[in-house]
Amino acid sequence: MQNNNVQKNSVTLVPGVGSAYKNGWRQLWKYFLGLFLIGIIGFIIGIPTGMNEWVQGATAAGILGFLAFIYGILVEGPVQYGVAFAFLKAARGDKLEIKDMFEAFKNYWNAVLASLFVGVIIVIGLVLLIVPGIIFACKLAFTPYLVVDRKMAVMEAIEESWRMTGGHAWKVFFIGLLAIPICIAGLLCFIVGIIISLMCVNLAFASLYHAVSSSGMASVQEGVPTT
């Protein structure tokens, strides 16, 4: 399925860890206010998923926990996919609007099921051994973008993410690995620092997807590392 959402003046990138973070940092300041507002709204929408911790008593906590789980699947999951799409639009230099964070609702059930399936696959991998879980997480990292950006069905998005990350999965891993010291540095700068760090990391992931998607360099074999 062709991607009709990319604008002609989109940022051109070569897939790489360094280029992804460089573009993420550059676009962060260009779209800071819009992304900040989207992040705040997304955070508020996600608050009910932890509501089982608000009450005492096993029964009440259990009921609220179940409701929070359902809410997380049906509401927060699609919203988080929409937030990822908003970061993608910023990463490639497109016009960003608050409503972009709700874009996943245009492909609602595929977003719900994709979020659920990917989560289950990663958990199974982590339960078996930590390494398979990490591999699954890296190979399926592009699924949210594909579901929202290209309006793909669940299995189509999962298969395409697996294909696209061939030769690039290690880059997804190192972007995630570098996120650890970046977020630690952000914590040292308190609230403002961690917000900037998280936004930069999300933009880096989105930048890598955009680079791989637009360059046609996705392959089924591992490539030579480039930064």
Region spans (language model):
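Short, contiguous pre-domain boundary segments
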Residues: 1-13
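Short, charged juxtamembrane terminal tails flanking transmembrane helices
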Residues: 2-5, 212-227
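Selective recognition of hydrophobic, aromatic-rich stretches within alpha-helical transmembrane segments
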Residues: 12, 60-92, 119-159, 186-218
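Interfacial aromatic "cap" segments that immediately flank transmembrane helices
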Residues: 12-45, 95-124, 136-187, 224-227
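Alpha-helical hydrophobic membrane-insertion segments
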Residues: 33, 41, 45-47, 60-70
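Juxtamembrane "helix exit" motif at the C-terminal ends of alpha-helical transmembrane segments
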Residues: 44-57, 187
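Membrane-interface helix-boundary signature
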Residues: 58-64, 168, 172
